[in-house]
Amino acid sequence: MHLALFGAALSLVASAAASSFPHPHSNHVRTASGQATTEETIPGYFSGSCTKDKMTIRKEWRHLSKVQQTDFLDAVQCLMDKPAKSGLTATTSRFSDLQALHRGMTNTVYADIIHHVGQFLPWHRYYMHIYETILRDECSYTGFIPYWNEVKDADSGDMWGSSMWGADAFGGNGTGSGNCVQDGRFANYTLHIGPGDEDTDYCLQRAFDSEEAIANANSTALKMCNSYNTYSPWSDCISNIPHKGVHTYIGGVMSDIKSSPGDPVFFMHHMYVDRMWWLWQKQDPANRLYDISGPTVNETANVEPAGGWQNATLHYELSSFSIMPNTTIGKVMNPQGGYLCYGYDSE
């Protein structure tokens, strides 16, 4: 059973982004096929304190050694065991602080300000940075958050074939009438935030739908999204097809637009979404690295103000209810711009 499912497509509202942030040089590398490489050694992106030597390379789950996989799962469990600090409603652990943060951003005075808005991708990039920072600072984690290469599994026809769904990792599908996950490192994990805006005790739920997940996450769907050359239509497509599709068809907790970070797989999924954005940005960095547009409030849940919708710009402030200091969209647009310092492997 799906919970509060991810919403309909957002409007294609575009605006010119401010240009006061540093832009990359144009000497990026291309392969013979014309596609930008996924290696993160391309000159021109690094700025501020980020250098090639300092940069973290995020890897696909299957590229981690068994020790690295265990270290990551141990760090996630550490957050689940640590007491909450945020003071947000219904929090019981540091991990639940992050779930409550995500839900809180869907319940502002302007309703949901992190989905169906221009800042959808920048805010979630910031959110991944918060998660990674807390894992390191509070659980002594020295690695990175891995991602799940969803298109690889969708194209193979076996959406749930990755070892990440194994009994020694995140566990697999839910079972029984409640779709509770009963294997893996987080078997029988109890959530207290959600479903939706409720605060109840319930199990970690999944309800896989392989056919629909494959249709939304395969290379045909991704190719369609990548046919868009500007941020708003590309972001809309990614948000509503591979992003929303995988959330919905993992089902259970992941299909709850408000409280989906209660499933640790959420962060693997959003690392992949972030990787898709970064690869798209690098295809044409002169035009895409700082390309931002779209409304800052969810038009489906608000009445248009007399002055029209405010569009996202590089100066728009991203907030986390003081879990980490606020930053701006401009600071997170370039993963190697100094505020952030990471790349992705070349799978």
Question: Model-found features: residue ranges?
Answer:
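Fungal secretory targeting signals
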Residues: M1-T31
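Intrinsically disordered, flexible peripheral segments
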Residues: S19-E347
